[in-house]
Amino acid sequence: MFFVRPLFSRISPLQRSISLNNVKKSKFDSSPITNGADYLRSLSGRNLKIYLFGKLVEDPLNHPMIRPSINAVAETYDLAARDPELASATSPMTGARVNRFLHIAQSSDDLVMQGKMQRRLGQLTGTCFQRCVGMDAINSLHSTTFDMDAKYNTTYHQRFLAWVTAMQQANFVLGGAMTDVKGDRSKAPHAQEDPDLFVHVTRRSDAGVWITGAKAHQTGCLNSHWLLVMPTIRLGEQDRDYAIVGAVPVDAEGITYIYGI
């Protein structure tokens, strides 16, 4: 679970243009991640506010309860290095080979290869390797933003493609923050006693949006570089502020992670 109270999303595929150089230099090392060892190094030195069983975690990278899940993600990089045919693909945006978890499927063969890669990673790790929701999210948002632009004459799709391209070139892990806390399941988000049971927009400006709320069951968020925050239920007109999809860095100011509940 993680809470966002409040968070200013400075860069979002649905709000702002994005610069690859700015992404790399502002948050992570300037070199793309190429293997599991690189990935582990990319997690060092982050300022994450994490609580595990009521205690603040000072070093999540080497915490004995967290490290096994990190090792599983590292294997997604090492498999791509050992078997690029299985775990990487050619990006239609850049023409370069990218990790298959960052690839937007172009054919039924791509989907078959996704399944084969996931099956192999399950055999190698024996656990969840935490990148499936992020992969599914960029694939669904690819078509959703395209349809939105066609209907509303917006520019979401090109902004989204620019962000995905930046993620591919840096070879980042994308966490999919989808599951809501929900609260009273008989009520819509806007009718909840606590509005923060669902992530929602609290302020908008030309610079971006401010969001607040909670998501649940996001173990892989700690092991990601960026989060795609998405709603998970059907929303009505009164839930407009809850209909937000955006990308935020894992170590963005204002995020609190509650791990292990």
Give short role names for the model-derived ranges:
Residues 181-261:
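FAD-binding core of flavoproteins
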